[in-house]
UniProtKB/Swiss-Prot annotation:
Record PTM N6-(pyridoxal phosphate)lysine, positions in chain: K86
E.C. no: 4.2.1.20
Record has Amino-acid biosynthesis as a keyword: yes
Species assigned in the record: Francisella tularensis subsp. tularensis (strain SCHU S4 / Schu 4)
Catalytic reaction list: (1S,2R)-1-C-(indol-3-yl)glycerol 3-phosphate + L-serine = D-glyceraldehyde 3-phosphate + L-tryptophan + H2O
Key words of the record: Amino-acid biosynthesis, Aromatic amino acid biosynthesis, Lyase, Pyridoxal phosphate, Tryptophan biosynthesis
Protein name per UniProt: Tryptophan synthase beta chain
Length: 396
């Protein structure tokens, strides 16, 4: 029986109740078979093209880095059906669930983007869908909650713990433990127990593959750096995967520094966490001196996660990728700038990556460089959050 590697260096693994091991084994075997099955790959490809709208554009910015020698491109995952990169891998996993004969889908969501993507895939493929969402996130992401319900999903608010994404993850795993024979747990990021980090990476890797081809067509060379925000890390690993072996391309992940790393109110476990066991995996984790999981914080619900995918931890450990962070204010400034200068409203998550790219462009305006930011989602869901903050600051 062929097996995928469960670890990335020392990170990853499968720390779950014994009852879930057969379900994870089945998932791994079906994934391996599906990857070798031309008809599965063809169906996935057709859904991505005809339904989701791939390939997405690689847009060269016109004004935002005008006074520098940087060329900045945006990989437009915001143009994907559903509004973010999430749709890619959800379609892949939903097809896998059907292949396994599962009729129900369980999911967790933070910003609601993964929930929306799961709901649309379930509507399309005729699967029953229930989504766990922290009660706090239900409040701050009401448009997405309604979108899920419109597409037939049941949204279950989670009131335990911090009532955010980590609690929704725990509840979803609990549900799956009780119902794995008929339900597939459609995990929303490149984290959690093996084989999820690998499956999600493979179902997102077209982001980097397309970027590579588009960049060669437009510029005749590969970019100097690809930059992506990191919460759980799926949009980033989707961008990085095809560039890992291209040693001249820097891989830069951007974690949320929240109100500032020094305040403790952030979501940057890669650079400021300790290794621990959470959500079925061994990975960097925000924890206090007693080893208790600390609350993560970010202006963007989708980055508000106290851990991170194991492959990112490994890429950092071996020095292949670099991880920076951007504060709420820096992300907000980048958000406003992209709206005003390019006519694109980005997700607050993606704005963290953009903030770092702008920093690179402006710290040495005379440096010639070719940068790509993965614009992982659109910002419609964030306009009310931004409105309230700008109002509070007296800017509107």
């Amino acid at each position: 029986m062929s097996k995928l590697n469960a670890y990335f260096g020392e990170y990853g693994g499968q720390f779950v109740p014994q009852i879930l091991v057969p379900a994870l084994d089945q998932l791994e075997q079906e994934f391996i078979k599906a990857q070798a099955d031309e008809s599965f790959k063809q169906e996935f490809k057709e859904l991505l093209q005809e339904y989701a709208g791939r390939p997405t554009a690689l847009t060269k910015t016109r004004n935002i880095v005008k006074n520098t020698r940087t060329k900045l491109y945006l990989k437009r995952e915001d143009l994907l059906h559903g509004g973010a990169h999430k749709t890619n891998q959800v379609l892949g996993q939903a097809l896998l669930a059907k292949r396994m004969g599962k009729k129900e889908i369980i999911a967790e969501t933070g910003a609601g983007q993964h929930g929306v993507a799961t709901a649309l895939a379930c509507a399309l493929l005729d699967l029953k869908c229930r989504v766990y969402m922290g009660a706090k996130d239900v409040e701050r992401q009401s448009p997405n909650v309604f979108r899920m319900k419109l597409m037939g999903a049941e949204v279950i608010p989670v009131h335990s713990g911090s009532a955010t994404l980590k609690d929704a993850c725990n509840e979803a795993l609990r549900d799956w433990s009780a119902n794995y024979s008929k339900a597939h747990y459609l995990l929303g990021t490149a984290a959690g127990p093996h084989p999820f980090p690998t499956i999600v990476r493979e179902f997102q890797r077209m982001i980097g593959e397309e970027t590579k081809q588009q960049m060669l067509a437009k510029e005749g060379r590969l970019p100097d750096a690809v930059i992506a925000c990191v919460g759980g890390g799926s949009n980033a690993i989707g961008m990085f995967a095809d560039f890992i072996d291209e040693k001249n391309v820097k891989l830069i992940g951007v974690e949320p520094a929240g109100k500032g790393i020094e305040t403790g109110e952030h979501g940057a476990p890669l650079k400021h966490g300790k290794t621990g066991i959470f959500f079925g995996m061994k990975a960097p984790l925000m924890q206090n001196s007693d080893g208790q999981i600390e609350e993560s914080y970010s202006i963007s619900a989708g980055l508000d996660f106290p851990s991170v995918g194991p492959q990112h931890a490994h890429l950092l450990a071996i020095g292949r990728a670099k991880y920076a962070s951007a504060t709420d204010d820096e992300a907000l400034d980048a958000f406003k700038l992209l709206c005003k200068k390019e006519g694109i409203i980005p997700a607050l998550e993606s704005s963290h990556a953009l903030a770092h790219a702008l920093k690179l462009a402006y710290e040495d305006p005379n440096k010639e460089q070719l940068l790509v930011v993965n614009l992982s989602g659109r910002g419609d869901k964030d306009i009310f959050t931004v409105h309230d903050i700008l109002k509070e600051k007296g800017e509107i």
